[in-house]
């Protein structure tokens, strides 16, 4: 299973319609688009998927739709993290029922939980996942939970934990984790340092911008396998030019707008309180969509 979890995993967006409801047809198209661009798997229901502005029922519905489109074709990881252990367990059970390959959970946030409470939270989710491997999700910039290296080392050795999504930007820590846990599946979480993360020991990555240019990230992986660091850096630079624009527009709404211009997503809106993309960026996003479609073809 560890080998199946390695690779380039798109952190899947969740399309909504003009009434702010789940757009299931756009979601299906997006899943098929990602499969078509050659990614290894999907990370469903995470930060990029706007999970924390959805109800549990909606999150389960997303898992069900994605499984219908992609089960058995690519690796599927269900992010089931919430502040509530019971709700995370419910989502983990759903992931097992729908045939996902693994579950993942961000550290419980908002309240100042003790580290042992974090460990108990993960143990409970692992139990409810009924044999599915756990991917611990470390994203201190958004969760507010700043784990020490010793705490990370403890979490990744809990029974049932197979992988870590490391979204911290600390490449030294990435290398330290790899050195301490050679068999752990380690994901780079920040797209803008993907190549550097691989060189620091990551097995692959989970990222938002893979939704629109996953083939570029696969190209980085292949270049490094062939020892062509210069090519990997050139591809990373091309990815980062896109990321520069998306940071200005707002990453999730910018991605949805590009996918709208690619005829994948019908409505390029995130769920409120996220605002729409500022109209001044629309020409640049449309040009980007055209460039990527030509490159992919």
Curated annotation (Swiss-Prot):
E.C. no: 4.1.3.3
Domain of life: Bacteria
Protein purpose: Catalyzes the reversible aldol cleavage of N-acetylneuraminic acid (sialic acid; Neu5Ac) to form pyruvate and N-acetylmannosamine (ManNAc) via a Schiff base intermediate.
Protein family membership: Belongs to the DapA family. NanA subfamily.
Protein name: N-acetylneuraminate lyase
Reaction catalysis annotation: aceneuramate = aldehydo-N-acetyl-D-mannosamine + pyruvate
Subcellular location(s) per record: Cytoplasm
Active site, renumbered: 137 (proton donor), 165 (schiff-base intermediate with substrate)
Annotated SUPFAM superfamilies: Aldolase
Assembly notes: Homotetramer.
CC annotations in GO: cytosol
């Amino acid at each position: 299973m560890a080998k199946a979890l390695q690779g380039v995993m798109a952190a899947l967006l969740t399309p909504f319609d003009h009434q702010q409801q789940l757009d299931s047809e756009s979601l299906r198209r997006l899943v098929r688009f990602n499969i078509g661009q050659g990614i290894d798997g999907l990370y469903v229901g995470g930060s990029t998927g706007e999970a924390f502005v959805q109800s549990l029922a909606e999150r389960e519905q997303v898992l069900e739709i994605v499984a219908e489109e992609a089960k058995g074709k690519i690796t599927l990881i269900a992010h089931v993290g919430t502040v509530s252990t019971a709700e995370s367990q419910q989502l983990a059970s759903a992931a097992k029922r729908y045939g996902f390959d693994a579950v993942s959970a961000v550290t419980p946030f908002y309240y100042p939980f003790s580290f042992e409470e974090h460990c108990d939270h993960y143990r409970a989710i692992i139990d409810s996942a009924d044999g599915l491997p756990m991917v611990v999700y470390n994203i201190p910039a958004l969760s507010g939970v700043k784990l020490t290296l010793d705490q990370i080392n403890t979490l990744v050795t809990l029974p049932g934990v197979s992988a870590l999504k490391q979204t911290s930007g600390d490449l030294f820590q990435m290398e330290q984790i790899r050195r301490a846990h050679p068999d752990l599946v380690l994901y780079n979480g920040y797209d803008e340092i993907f190549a550097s993360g691989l060189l620091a020991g990551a097995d692959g990555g989970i990222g938002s911008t893979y939704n629109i240019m996953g083939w570029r990230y696969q190209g980085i992986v292949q270049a490094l396998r062939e020892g062509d660091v210069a090519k990997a850096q050139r591809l990373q630079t091309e990815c980062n030019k896109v990321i520069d624009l998306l940071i200005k527009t707002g990453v999730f709404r910018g991605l949805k707008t590009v996918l709208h211009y690619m005829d994948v997503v019908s409505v390029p809106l995130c769920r409120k309180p996220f605002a729409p993309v500022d109209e001044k960026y629309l020409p640049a996003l449309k040009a980007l969509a055209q460039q990527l479609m030509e490159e992919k073809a």
